[in-house]
Amino acid sequence: MYEQRRDSSMDFPSRNQGKAGDSSGRRLQTRRRVASPGHNPPPVSVQHYENFPVASWLCPPALRPAVRAIYWFARTADDIADEGDTPAATRQALLADYRVDLAKAATGEPASARWRGVFEPLAEAIRAHALPVPLLSALLDAFEEDTRHAGYADRAALLDYCSRSASPIGRLLLHLHGLHDARLQRQSDAVCSALQLINFWQDLSIDLPRGRDYVPRSDAAAHATTTAQCLRAPRADASRALVRDLCAWARELMLEGAPIAPAVPGRVGWELRFVVQGGLRILAKIESMNFASFARRPRLHAVDHLLIGLRALTMRPSLPQPARIA
């Protein structure tokens, strides 16, 4: 469900990658652009946005236009929120304008020329599938928070962010597949949040030097350290112990949501199997590095992808099969 990065790692819900191009790991960004006036997104498969759970070959053809529309909505907002050296106030103003166009799309009014290529398809998707607009609005809340990024005091604060930056995507895709069961929604939230956390913990060596600190301060304090100290001594016992605890948290959350994968029938269920096993495999790779994520980023290789596939194929409702080191 979540695409693989071009650097042989995995794409999960995060604010860390997702644009086409390089292998640096930081959102695969070369230099991303806010959609220009009259911008018309090309009909690509949904394979570049980090918060997007999609493997296009598993997406039913009838749903692909709506999935693309949601993708371009999220990707363009992501571009605005993380537009290089643009002042935060400017990005916030652009996101406010973007939110106005979302409201217009929801009511069938014409969007502004600037993002017409984004909102015309989205308006059609909203109309055709009765997309829950509050979920789209929640994504914008998260992007606005990104422009004010000041870190997170504790796990509850970070999970609150995930509830707006990651969980809405899972719920939108469940909605498109006609899945509205509350239990499935809770499990989807757990999987999406877990994937977001996994991406944070695999990208510590990349994000922190760029001013993006997602480590809850309470977790760092519990190990009598700070993220700045961990960057200076990435292989110190406290640094590794901190990553170990963070990965255990992400794994627990993933296993909480994992039963959704074998429980959901059809293509989306198979997609979810790969999502769950991919996330667990990344955690296993971090463990194989002795939790040295402050020093470097884990990478998946061909054997890892084979293991992900095998474990996805053999998942059972009562056996999520956590991906341990082979």
Set out the residue ranges of the language-model regions.
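Extreme N-terminal basic, low-complexity initiation segments
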Residues: 1-10
